[in-house]
A protein has these predicted regions:
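Juxtamembrane transmembrane-helix boundary motif
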Residues: 1-16, 27-33, 37, 57-145, ...
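Hydrophobic alpha-helical transmembrane segments of multi-pass integral membrane proteins
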Residues: 172-188, 240
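Membrane-interface alpha-helices at helix entry/exit sites of multi-pass transporters
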Residues: 36-46, 167-178
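Short, structured loop/turn "capping" segments at alpha-beta junctions
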Residues: 116, 152-157, 168-172
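Transmembrane helix boundary and interhelical junction motifs in multipass membrane proteins
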Residues: 18-26, 151-159
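Short hydrophobic/aromatic, small-residue-rich stretches within specific transmembrane helices
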Residues: 44-48, 177-181, 203-207
Length: 251
């Protein structure tokens, strides 16, 4: 199990540079090292909580969190609980998610300049909270349910959607994603703790590893990296997440 240390550190570092926590990759890694499948979702959610907390702290300090965008997304919390307490066949959902992730990744990597132009137009429109809520409320509800069901925070879908629709620039999207992941993961973990036993003996040592990786990565993303580099990194990470989720089809 010592192999978990460098793998989880790397995942938490790279994902946190863009405000993500790495839940989909934690799942893939834990599957590969032979952790019991029923144990994995709450462990992944717990690690998400650690990384998303420190990522949110760094992006908040850097002034990138937009409450106009983030507050309506918090409707996801009760839906994450519903998803986390629901037992459904996952394979069909995973196929849809993998297609969505690869599509988002391709759009991010191939249309960087168009994204920047779209974001500038949205910024000039200065949409009211009520109009933004028409996008963020249903988005939060859908992604909250999905994230609780699958056992990840949901930011891996949220970030590309916010960027591709022009609602947020990459750093604002990263800050919103970290808050979204944190609240959903807490809700999902609570739901899992009601329906099954949570392996805190496994979680605690791994939490220290991802705490360090998450702190260093999110600090780099919040204060150092440019928007263009963040779009590229998000595109790559979303593609990797798609590959990792696809591995669940064979386990």
């Amino acid at each position: 199990m010592i192999i978990l240390v460098p793998l989880l550190f790397a995942v938490s570092f790279f994902y946190s540079t863009v405000g993500l926590a790495g839940g989909s990759s934690y799942i893939a890694i834990l599957v590969l090292v032979g952790v019991n499948l029923f144990t994995i979702p709450p462990v992944s959610l717990a690690l998400n909580i650690v990384v998303a907390s420190i990522a949110l702290f760094n992006y908040l300090r850097a002034g990138h969190l937009s409450l106009r965008i983030s507050i309506p997304l918090l409707i996801s919390v009760p839906f994450a609980f519903i998803g986390g307490s629901t037992i459904l066949p996952e394979k069909t959902l995973i196929i849809i998610f993998v297609i969505a992730l690869f599509s988002a990744s391709a759009m991010l990597l191939l249309s960087g300049n168009q994204i920047k132009n779209r974001q500038e137009k949205i910024r000039k429109l200065n949409l009211s909270l009520s109009r933004l809520s028409l996008i963020t409320l249903p988005l939060g509800a859908i992604l909250g349910t999905v994230s609780g069901l699958v056992g990840i925070g949901g930011g891996i879908w949220l970030s590309p959607i916010l960027i591709l629709t022009g609602v947020a620039n990459p750093k604002t999207a990263a800050a919103s994603a970290s808050l979204f992941i944190l609240t959903n993961s807490i809700s999902g973990l609570f739901a899992h703790s009601i329906t099954q036993e949570v392996d805190f003996a496994l979680i605690l040592p791994l939490a220290f590893v991802v705490l360090l990786g998450g702190f260093l990565g999110s600090r780099l993303g919040a204060f150092k990296l440019s928007h263009e580099k963040l779009i590229f990194i998000i595109g790559i990470i979303v593609a990797v997440a798609g590959i990792n989720l696809a591995t669940r089809l064979f386990n």
